């Protein structure tokens, strides 16, 4: 690659010509880095369909040598990025047109180089609801989370998150960088929801225990999980686990802290030190750079890099937007290439499909920050001396904030299939006597996996003292509907006195009178009568207070905002935080755009 050309930049046509000229008649590449970089990065500058049209036009006007090089270029494109041709039918058809045109002109040798029909299906990369592949022997005792080996739990968490990570394509990164959020990006949205789900599930598992000793034992177990994740070089799930353990609802549990051993504290501190954001995550970057074999990057850090590059450097080197800024292209390519290389290596673990089903549902047991904090207060109430302090809430999740304020909402049919399969797993694993029902004793084992499962009698609809598959399926479907499929963002209503006429979004009647109180959602601002609350079917769409570079308001709607880890506290397992009363803004809760 001529460095002088790169320094001054290249037009689209110039870089296409350079890529084509990199191939000899035998298909050998003289500059593979340039070709690989352009084929990955070209959608940033030109749609794939337009690139295919340019190649078609060049093949029509070129000589035999030129046509053969073009076909070698297309062949390399298909071999390196096959998913593009399966997931983009228009692009696939354009390449077929090129192949047919070559055949019609008698260029069968060149045409034979283009084999698009052998491209496998990549539809699974666009499926948001995930299913784990089979493997492993069913062991009932290992599926109780209280007794699950930390290494095994770390491996299954790795399997779940990496499966979701492997679906992310270049177009998803590109969309995220352009919008600054996951608008219209369900694959990345689901990945973020899973990341947040792990963090929140850890908080719920700790808070599900009633004594400080039990909670300390759960914390120790998850620190051991984090150790195993580090051994596996899974930095993404490691960040999620550390974020859950350092959440303010856990860090305020002083009685629990007193039962955590110095050894556990030392391990935890070392993990915090590794993941600190100091010097732009320098410690994590150094550690990740030395990794060989399977490695799972902390995606949030690398997305931050992409955002920073996009904001700092222009796409084009001229005002007319005809000359590509090759410097930016190379830097963005380096980040994305590192992520795509990590996707190629499968984790060296075998997954138990029944455990994956239970774990997936457990991770989707959505609770609001306020609900979790209130549960924390129930476990360890405030000391009297702290009750007079404080008007603003503790930071909701130091050191690692959630990436998103919204969970992905799955297709209803897929949700039903997922719940039915999960129920089958529950009965296969916990129906000890094989009578097709869950007894009260067996129900206690099931509840270990779902700390906030309702009472036995509420699931046992016919009150015969046992739960059938139909009753359990019905319960989960019912619960999913109430909680917006356990993954959606439900309304966060608060009483409000309206000083001007406001209409109810359910019955459309006015909420009138100075002393007439109604309800207003703190997230999306929707209003309704108290008696209409349970009948309201409108989805909560959290408002954005974001401003683009041009000062324009970002699009309001159902999308994600991404927040990165902040600096970790280093001295102790949990810093001495002053407890403060949870507080919400009167007019709404907003997300800040990067």
From Swiss-Prot:
Ca(2+) 1 binds at residues 431, 433, 435, 437, 442. Residues 418-453, 455-482 form the EF-hand domain. Coiled coil: none annotated. One of its GO terms (cellular component) is synapse. Its main location: cytoplasm. InterPro entries: C1-like_sf, EF-hand-dom_pair, EF_Hand_1_Ca_BS, EF_hand_dom, PE/DAG-bd, Ras-like_GEF, Ras-like_Gua-exchang_fac_N, Ras_GEF_dom_sf. Residues 149-382 form the Ras-GEF domain. It is found in: Cytoplasm, Cytosol; Cell membrane; Synapse, Synaptosome. It comes from the Eukaryota. PANTHER family: GUANINE NUCLEOTIDE EXCHANGE FACTOR, RAS GUANYL-RELEASING PROTEIN 2. Belongs to the RASGRP family. Functions as a calcium- and DAG-regulated nucleotide exchange factor specifically activating Rap through the exchange of bound GDP for GTP. May function in cell aggregation and adhesion. This is RAS guanyl-releasing protein 2-B. It comes from Xenopus laevis (African clawed frog).
